[in-house]
Amino acid sequence: MDDSDTLEFSDILASTMHDTKNSLGMLYNTLDTLIGQCQEKGCPVQQDHFLLQYELRRLNHNFIRMLSLYKAKKANFPISLDYHSVSDCLDEAIVVNEPLLTSKGIDIELQCPADLFWSFDKELIMGILDSMLNNAYLYTKDKLMVSARREDGYLVVQLEDNGPGYPDYFLMDSRRKSGSAGSHVSFLTGSTGLGLYFSVLVAKSHTRDGREGFIRTMNGGIYNGSVFCLHLP
């Protein structure tokens, strides 16, 4: 076998992750069906089913992030820009996660102008929103605000909760190369760090007139908890 017939280990690993991600998707859909049946019968282990659903989604998000990072390293990070209704996209992301969040008594509120449209890669942005909403299941107390607005030529999508807030080392502004607490985050350790790194990568891939998208994390907001901000030019 010559070198041209030899697959790199990273390619084999990426292919395996892709197959595993698809299997997780099938498991998630099956569990979703079981949850619906359990709900109709007043199943006493319904909350356990929701917890399993949360973990499956978390694993699936990690595989999606790793595959995206692999494609980025191969200089093949896919971007497909089109104009979308921001309100419809946010509502779609909430609907997908609402059963999981409401099972824990989390109240979700959406604030977005109906006439707000923007150009972005819907699949990638929905991946960020889905991941952040899924994380809220674990970190918020019982409130979550999802909002969007125009600000200084950017689309700003913001998620706020009434949880304990981000630890100091997790506060960041991805426009800064150094000198911020966020610069000390080890993105490759822990699912939360990987999720943030993926979000930064997706944001930066959206460019317009020499400007890049960026991510900010802070504490405060209307609930005095954590605030995640996605800025797209």
What residue ranges belong to the model's regions?
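Conserved micro-motifs of the catalytic ATP-binding
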Residues: 74-79, 117-120
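Conserved catalytic submotifs in the C-terminal HATPase_c
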Residues: 82-83, 107-116
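Short beta-strand/loop element within the Bergerat-fold HATPase_c
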Residues: 143-153
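A conserved beta-strand-to-alpha-helix junction within the catalytic ATP-binding
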Residues: 82-94
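Glycine-rich ATP-binding loops of the HATPase_c
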Residues: 204-221
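Acidic ATP/Mg2+-coordinating residue in the GHKL
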Residues: 161
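Short conserved segment of the HATPase_c
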Residues: 166-182
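Short alpha-helical segment of the dimerization/phosphotransfer core of two-component systems
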Residues: 54-62
